[in-house]
Amino acid sequence: MAQFNKNQLIACRRNGTTTSDFNQTEVAEFFLMGFSNSWDIQIVHAALFFLVYLAAVIGNLLIIILTTLDVHLQTPMYFFLRNLSFLDFCYISVTIPKSIVSSLTHDTSISFFGCALQAFFFMDLATTEVAILTVMSYDRYMAICRPLHYEVIINQGVCLRMMAMSWLSGVICGFMHVIATFSLPFCGRNRIRQFFCNIPQLLSLLDPKVITIEIGVMVFGTSLVIISFVVITLSYMYIFSVIMRIPSKEGRSKTFSTCIPHLVVVTLFMISGSIAYVKPISNSPPVLDVFLSAFYTVVPPTLNPVIYSLRNRDMKAALRRQCGP
């Protein structure tokens, strides 16, 4: 087991946290206290999470397979959708399987390294999802508002670069959060009021006097979300202004059908995630934190395949072609 370095131990002593209430050794593991200790409730939680996880995996893998194999779906729009589906598959896999196992085995512990790794991937994928949703809104803007320039500007090289930048932004943000959080002393506090290692709940374990750096990182991450939200909002303002000028009702309806799913996904993910990160952890009931986190962790990856494919004629046609005559 690794021990506190000298600076961490001094910080704990200075802030009065190395009393008999807390250990003076480094936290070696955390305990996830998200759901009730009742066996019946844990079984229900595990069953619900398993069904939701299964639906999310099947739905997102189906989109990945269809957009990869079908020649009619080799367009920028479906390239971005394929990336989003792969990301959602990874995003829900970071938290849900561990939570299911914990409920079934009564073992809520997670190692210090495992917690840091889970927090990194969660922040990485959440940031990447925001970036990809922003890129997809720009793609819709170009396709609807600048159709004559669309194929020239949104070419294969541009698509690859935008995706690379999206994934890179997630990695950078994930590293920044994890390094800023896990380099600070927990001073023996190791019970997380959540079903996974979430940064806001981890911050509540730290002394307020030593989290200045992490607050700066949180402000940076929030700024990225605000910028993305502004870009998405402006894109759709232009898109809707163009759609309303389309003379035929059928043309407006068809164009709206390509935009509404993306707008619903953006609203679900960004609003729920923003509320969870902006509201003060200490002033909210633990059950509210857990259910809000469950919402933005589970709902978007599960509903995205349904939202994007339920009314999408191209996806339905691709499924029929792949399944045979």
Swiss-Prot record:
Q: Does the keyword Oxidoreductase apply?
A: no
Give the bilayer topology.
Answer: Multi-pass membrane protein
Tell me the domain of life: Eukaryota
Q: Which cysteines are joined by disulfide bonds?
A: none
Q: Which residues lie on this side of the membrane: Extracellular?
A: 1-43, 94-117, 173-214, 277-289
Pfam families associated with the record? 7tm_4
| Primary subcellular site in the record, as a coarse category | membrane
Provide the transmembrane region boundaries: 44-64, 73-93, 118-138, 152-172, 215-235, 256-276, 290-310
Task: Identify the residue ranges that face the Cytoplasmic compartment according to the record.
Answer: 65-72, 139-151, 236-255, 311-325
Annotated InterPro entries = GPCR_Rhodpsn, GPCR_Rhodpsn_7TM, Olfact_rcpt, Olfactory_GPCR
Q: What role does this protein play?
A: Odorant receptor.
- UniProt similarity note: Belongs to the G-protein coupled receptor 1 family.
Q: Which PANTHER family match?
A: OLFACTORY RECEPTOR (PTHR26452)
Its name, as the record gives it, is Olfactory receptor 14L1
| Taxonomic source organism | Homo sapiens
Annotated gene: OR14L1
